[in-house]
């Protein structure tokens, strides 16, 4: 189930995408939903709820601007600290920049303290603080530096008035701020008019920050912030202002592009849709969607915030600047006072010396897919240079092209032509000659000049380097060379004059050498360094302390509340032993500490009531029973009682309620009782006395004195058993209530015994600790108990119902008090029945009851027998289970009996005992009687005064189970007078019938099955990943467990899974399910587990509940696991022998299946040589062995090709692999076996041209709809059995998991790594590749034709993950519905194929039809595609999946990503699709069905484009090729041979039956393969790898040609070769020779030679394993 978890994680990743959720919304109202749709919808809903819950915990920020969903998602990702939403109610200029400014302000404020703090917002928008944070002390410095600033101020004043006059409610703080601002503006304007200094306002001022006159009150912390406000302020002025105001912490942000550090003068700010531009020492910022005035700032002052790290203020304080976050186009920085470090270094000497410090930082550079290229042109007669950012791929392509050419081929025009051709998306005759980003064409001419000059210079430079390396590498050393080397080492190789000239050139800005045309790759980062040299040191001032008296006061109040509550509880403890009082007090005090947490509703309640609870007293102890819920009332209690508060909690807080502390008399636990004299335990009583409603601990009564009458003894034992069972249940109820009152049950998050729930009824009715769901209530009784004593009593319960469904979780009609509900009180039928029986039993007639038993196997139709043989006018029917009773009632009603009579006389046994009939009956029926106690049946007979009971049951299934382990029963089984065996089953699949017969569980005749299902079982254990419960798949099927504990665990595991049900094996007896998962979770042995002492009936019941499939999940590979594993391998023909239809209706040749035919091999003679084999090949295919094709692949790869091709694009700039030579075996046989090709661009184009682009066009006018309808209808009469056609939902967890388990690890990893959602997957795009292995030709065409490689068109792995499980399920359904004489080759070996033809009698003659199709995959048209989809519809495909599948098969794009080929294909079968083999097979079946009388076929087998059909001799068969061409577009030919063949295997009669044996000519051709490559560089490696490779080939050949040692097979094959290939000699000698070389590995190695450095190597056999599909 690790796979299942991996598949589940994949779905969770899908629902993270917004588009998936949108698609789910669009399909929410669809009526054709799939199970996969429901699963994803549920996951998406849970995911959205989780996101919503997390978002609600964040600060909500409404940015108000109109934003797209993409922009809003980008903001949420950029600022995850906030819950960003937009009401889309505003539209303005530079929207993203404005929204980002709001979020940046909130983000910076979240990093600064607010309480008892003054915040200077440098250049901030004071209006924002006034409107939304008027209670915070924020002062904004908004200087008027130009007219633009004055205009912004007027905008803010207008917005203030608009906000103030909108008529909505306002806070008092805002009103005060508004009045203050209005007064300040009047004073300021008056001062400006008078020419005097303006006054200051605590909300804002119009001065620069360094001149701000605002002084807050003392005792508050001072911090500052700046949001896009430092552009016009030098860093020095900023720190001077901070120093003057005593501010030690400043956090700000500004726009920045890292490309400024690279000298770029203009660029974009993509996130805010803006740009920057450097012009004359200034930097400008502007926005593309904004027409307002832009901003211009000093560039050097701006860059100081990036480059500087230390700044010394005017009075010596040192501030350190750090860039700490980059979000979008905004960079955040911190400016903190770090003077403390400089002062800490003051020493006697160091105080006179400066402090020096050095730091560095790395600025990351985005978009490194570009390079900087110098471009040149002439302007006004001068060469002008410009450095431009260009795509790295384009520049590298040009450089690589120059490197591939010789010096004399380096021409400007050629290079320019290449750059243009690779830059323009032009298709000429289907060939595209560019791939990559498009560059402006006027840049290409400049780029070509730069690259050409660069290449010429680099080549000259490389020549000099080579010369110098050759000279320095000389082994001859002279004194002159030594002196030259020493001189160069110390003075360099460049002369002093040259170095001086280069220095002067740099000073003058003159470029020279490689500086002119170097292509610069963008760095990953820019390193910035800064240092500090400090003489003067500032002074440190302390930060004002914060008064936390309010927080301390709240903590002390909480502590005092706890102490006060504890003291009040101490006063309520009466006299008693010190130890008892202490222990009780500790328990109560601990609860008080827990409950006094004021963060919970209960804590707040106790804290508020703890003072008043001390003063409240009640006058009598009766007040505690009134249900008023007093918090801490005083009571008069005995020495064994304690007092504790009763807590009243509202229903909404029920999950947070700690355990109740209920005052009651403390009693001893059950384990303390050691004698029967205990007053708390009722002594053993007469088993015939009724059980009252009091819930007590009772002892079990003694067993009755059994009389000699067996039936009477059974009746008494049954009554005794009921009494014991009731006493045990009552004792369990008593214990649960005591555990609750003793606080042993204290955590509602944990499970309660017997699924108990506790209800308090009073002024407020509430569930304690946890509340049930509506599905968990419906109890018929509950236990009422008191708070102060041990009185417990059963009381009936009523519930509010509507249409028999419970509508609420609170019962009706209960008085005040405590109530316990549990599984034991749900029905209480046994208690009611017992009390009823003990009253009426003495008066019942003691008549003897005759027992007649219909002993039938599972699914034999016992209920149907009752329906046919019961007369409800004279008999009644009793049954054990409610479901079986309801089913019988329904069927009797359908038969015509009145509904009232059916309800009266078809009853459950419990219903009958509680409400018996007054009328007497002579006989009655009892369904599943063996599950009941014999005494129950006898009592029912006496209550009916009956003489005979007709019982239905299975003696091998689970009998009556004693639920009271403390007692032993002797008379639970009844004596059968008449027994009738039924050995037929309508339910069980044939493999289960086969298993039951094989195990001999049932005596007498073998069981016969009527089911059409053959293989239905599967196993999962450690070897397949099932190791624990977490690996159990969650599927909508029925789960069976052996134990009740396992049932509970599985139920929890499957909670919420729609359609999943769970029961024990015992509970499932008599029931039927379509799909079953049988589960064993315990590794330890148990008597019920397979192999245990009582396991047989459980095994039978567990295996016989399903009709379609059973999967056994076991953590232990026990006996049942081994049996089922072996059962999976049983052949279908063996299973069919258990079928009733096979015994009444003869299958083809079934009359011969009981005949044992002696089939012994006749060993072939050990004679022959290679010459004989070679002679046969040369005479069969003359001229093929003389052909040398060794250099064909190289010639094609290295020569020019001239092809006409259309509907494709070609990227010729893809890398081309060189032709490689490898060490290969040298075969001694010379055949036309094509060499293994090496992939290349030419091979890919050839394969595409000769295969996918050469489709037949033979189809005439066709009425597709009519042909499809008629053919499908005919197919279901000729090919399929209607009753086996399955149209249930295709997409299930089970089918997806089975498909997933078959995938390779690589494929799984690829699918898990693909995070695309369904709307992002292009199902119409396929990958294209070529197979390196060439299919051998068994004709003369290799002499004149260069065979094109086979092409593979395959989708992406994620597309296979979408369609694969569906197609796999459809194929399985199709195969299971085929008729017995129709077969599909599903990777069958020769032996498996031979089994399909076993029923054919070799003496019969047949009309054989073999059709050879050409270009089969490529011949597919819309007729084939829709025909196959129509078939898929009949087996469950529908809805959106059907549409996607049809779309993926119509117009498709195939891409060869290795060699840059892209083609466009209409229809065709994609050879790498998940349904390729199945679709090809079905197309062949339908086409031949339309052209041939398939209803007369005796035997037909299909596999892809291969088919073999046998008709009775004399059947008139017209040549179908004409209709196949004109109607089905197939280019084919009909072949007539005496010996038929299928998939390269001849159907030959050997040993009295037909066999499929592989074609020997195909093997001989393969033995001439000259390209069996061996990896290795040394002799030992070549020998080792060669031995392994030859061993694999030999093992594969022996598996496929194992019968070649039989002379009878070789003789029959010799006849087949003469019939098919027409050699002019008898092939027997060559076949005997071939058999000789296959008998041993040593003989097989004689077929090949290999030489290493002239030495022939010998090879040893290495034991290897090969795959089943590995065929050589």
Curated annotation (Swiss-Prot):
EC number: 2.1.1.-, 2.7.7.-, 2.7.7.48, 3.6.4.13
Listed Gene3D superfamilies: P-loop containing nucleotide triphosphate hydrolases
Residues annotated as domain (+)RNA virus helicase C-terminal: 983-1145
Ligand binding (ATP): 856-863
Record-annotated RdRp catalytic domain positions: 1406-1519
Domain Alphavirus-like MT residues, every copy: 85-306
Protein name, UniProt field: Replicase large subunit
The organism of origin for this protein: Peanut clump virus (isolate 87/TGTA2)
Gene: rep
